[in-house]
């Protein structure tokens, strides 16, 4: 019996190959139960001759905390974006904009980074993705259709607010934002949005030098991280900060970043670290590796160092100074104010730890942030590798040397959120005896007790002279004024604006050929503001700018609708708040400077000065955008306008000029 079973087994083994040959699909079906993969490209991709982009939404899950308010409920979502070069031209430094509009927060994106900064990114108004590794999209022709070189898939994970059900809300649009490309409106079907972008035939590209890495970008603040010298365990880096915005500014700047691979700063020139903790160095990975190093002489071992500019007296110091554009006490001004103060440079010796112990291992720090005092808020993107920076040869010969490696970080000015500004504006006009003060909590209400005041109430109208009085001394006057004008006021009065700097825009006159206004700056802080500047965006009416009498003024190109102004030479100093004549009785007096501005109406068509054209659309102080009132002063019925009102304005400007001069000369 055993012999018979053995014969049957051998016979079966001999027949198996014949069965497989005769019925090949039988064995395949038994071994593999998965359906055949469909490699057919999307119809839009097959028809596109240019750059194809798509966005596909996945499901979403409800996050904590759970709330009954549907618009406040947070959901996690996943989606996939794809960009493919289907044309005959390589796309350098591709930039894909996704028009999110449901308060999305992008937590991660594989294959790409956001130009708005490191994750998580607030994408409420959309965000632009750029390649993290595959920064350029080569053509299918030159790569034999290698998808890894002609395309990038972006797996997006994030948080979205509001909506119903488990379907993820779709973005408004997707488009390629590179120069010279145009995209039609994207088409949507189901949970997928797609578009085919093509070259704009009318676009005339500027002649560009071919680059190995991503071309350098333009922003409000341009930071370059150059590696100048390289050793096995360390390298010398130079950081250059360029203020390229006509309205950008930083005072006492603080720069911070995050080391990602255990590096530390051994020494610095042209700047210094705010904190120096030897114990932190000894307990780090670097302290274990560099056992014989005297860490008491090390500049900083923090993962997130805070770096500051040196004061001016250190400029010629042999150890810490003697660098061009260094040592200005953290001041960065616009180029047209002072080119020598529009740039900052410092150098640092960076020590590395294993496994980066070779001369070609460079990893720039990430999560760059920079801020100042009463300055605009900057949002910095990730460091992007660019072609090496050229430098004049230090020998003095007509030769050029290059950095070993260079990265660029772009920082742009962000618009302040409501109740988060650092300066505010009040409105008044010659045809109304009530002034509209700064908005409630214009600069935030975090440091006050909102139980005693209403943080959301509209401010009470005031007599114009009350704008000179600190907020704490306005309450009684505001109530009396409301009673005189038969205006109701709430039992719980509005909270203050809490701004250290405020501006008053007073519409002074409106006549046939022109109009005038008076701008007044108030400093409610204890510290004086040096080298201040302001800017007024007046829209179409700004084209008629004629003169500003007590300040230096000029138009800001290219639109010429924004008026830039600063103090006259030797008078660009806005003092802080001071005590009244009798401190026990009189309120404090803010630092104040003012001037009249005149405008023409010729060749500007119809202007409704009182209806809104005579009030600024945006106001800036030291680069920071100030919060504006939500409405204008109303014209009283029956009031006539007279051009003769312009004469007192000029006299007021002259009087103000002499008063400021006398105050500065006497030191009061």
UniProtKB/Swiss-Prot annotation:
Tissue and organ expression note: Mostly expressed in flowers, stamen, anthers and pollen, and, to a lower extent, possibly in roots, stems, leaves and siliques.
TM annotation in the entry: none
Record's bilayer topology term: Lipid-anchor; GPI-anchor
One GO BP: cellulose microfibril organization
InterPro entries per UniProt: COB_C (IPR056900), COBRA_pln (IPR006918)
Positions of the pro-segment in this chain: 637-668
Subcellular location field: Cell membrane
Name this polypeptide is given: COBRA-like protein 11
Organism: Arabidopsis thaliana
């Amino acid at each position: 019996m055993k012999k018979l079973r053995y014969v049957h087994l051998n016979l079966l083994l001999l027949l198996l190959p014949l069965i497989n040959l005769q019925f090949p699909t039988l064995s395949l079906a038994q071994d593999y139960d998965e359906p055949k993969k469909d490699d057919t490209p999307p119809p839009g991709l097959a028809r596109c001759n240019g750059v194809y982009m798509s966005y596909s939404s996945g499901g979403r899950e409800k996050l904590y905390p759970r709330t009954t308010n549907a618009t406040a409920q947070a959901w996690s979502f996943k989606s996939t974006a794809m960009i493919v070069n289907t044309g005959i031209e390589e796309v350098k430094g591709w930039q894909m904009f996704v028009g999110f509009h449901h308060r999305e927060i992008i937590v991660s994106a594989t294959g790409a980074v956001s130009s708005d900064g490191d994750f998580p990114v607030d994408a409420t108004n959309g965000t632009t993705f750029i390649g993290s590794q595959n920064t350029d999209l080569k053509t299918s022709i030159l790569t034999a259709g290698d998808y890894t070189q002609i395309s990038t898939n972006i797996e997006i994970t994030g948080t979205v607010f509001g909506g119903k059900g488990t379907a993820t809300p779709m973005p408004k649009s997707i488009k390629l934002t590179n120069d010279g490309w145009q995209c039609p409106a994207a088409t949507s079907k189901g949970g997928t949005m797609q578009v085919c972008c093509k070259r704009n035939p009318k676009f005339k590209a500027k002649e560009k030098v071919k680059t190995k890495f991503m071309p350098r970008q333009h922003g409000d603040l341009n930071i370059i991280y150059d590696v100048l010298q390289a050793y096995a365990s360390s390298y010398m880096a130079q950081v250059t900060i360029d203020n390229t915005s006509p309205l950008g500014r930083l005072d006492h700047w603080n720069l911070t970043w995050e080391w990602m691979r255990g590096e530390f700063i051994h020494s610095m020139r042209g700047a210094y670290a705010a904190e120096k903790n030897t114990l932190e160095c000894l307990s780090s990975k670097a302290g274990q590796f560099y056992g014989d190093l005297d860490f008491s002489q090390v500049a900083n071992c923090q993962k997130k160092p805070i770096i500051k500019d040196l004061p001016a007296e250190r400029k010629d110091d042999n150890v810490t100074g003697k660098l061009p554009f260094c040592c200005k006490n953290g001041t960065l001004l616009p180029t047209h104010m002072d080119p020598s103060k529009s740039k900052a440079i410092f150098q640092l010796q960076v020590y590395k730890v294993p496994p980066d112990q070779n001369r070609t291992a460079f990893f720039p720090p990430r999560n760059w942030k920079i801020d100042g005092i009463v300055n605009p808020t900057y949002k910095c993107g990730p460091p992007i590798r660019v072609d090496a920076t050229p430098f004049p040869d230090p020998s003095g010969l007509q030769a050029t040397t290059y950095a070993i490696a260079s990265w660029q970080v772009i920082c742009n000015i962000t618009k302040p959120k409501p109740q988060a500004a650092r300066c505010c504006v009040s409105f008044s006009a010659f045809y109304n005896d009530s002034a509209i003060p700064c908005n409630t909590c214009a600069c935030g209400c975090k440091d006050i007790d909102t139980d005693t005041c209403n943080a959301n109430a509209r401010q009470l109208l005031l007599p114009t002279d009350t704008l000179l009085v600190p907020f704490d001394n306005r309450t009684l006057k505001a109530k009396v004024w409301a009673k005189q004008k038969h205006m109701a006021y709430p039992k719980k009065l509005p909270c203050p604006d809490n701004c250290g700097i405020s501006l008053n825009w007073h519409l002074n006159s409106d006549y046939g050929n022109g109009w005038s206004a008076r701008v007044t700056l108030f400093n409610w802080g204890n510290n004086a503001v040096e080298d201040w500047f302001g800017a007024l965006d007046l829209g179409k009416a700004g084209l008629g700018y004629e003169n500003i009498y007590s300040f230096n003024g000029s138009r800001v190109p290219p639109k010429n609708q924004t008026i830039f102004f600063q103090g006259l030479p030797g008078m660009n100093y806005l003092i802080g708040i001071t005590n009244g004549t009798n401190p026990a009785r009189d309120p404090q007096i803010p630092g104040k400077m003012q001037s009249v501005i005149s405008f023409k109406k010729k060749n500007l068509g119809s202007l409704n000065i009182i209806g809104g054209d005579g009030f600024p659309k945006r106001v800036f102080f030291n680069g920071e955008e100030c919060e504006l009132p939500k409405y204008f002063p109303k014209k009283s019925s029956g009031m006539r306008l007279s051009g003769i009102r312009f004469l007192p304005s000029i006299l007021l400007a002259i009087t103000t000029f002499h008063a400021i001069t006398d105050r500065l000369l006497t030191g009061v």
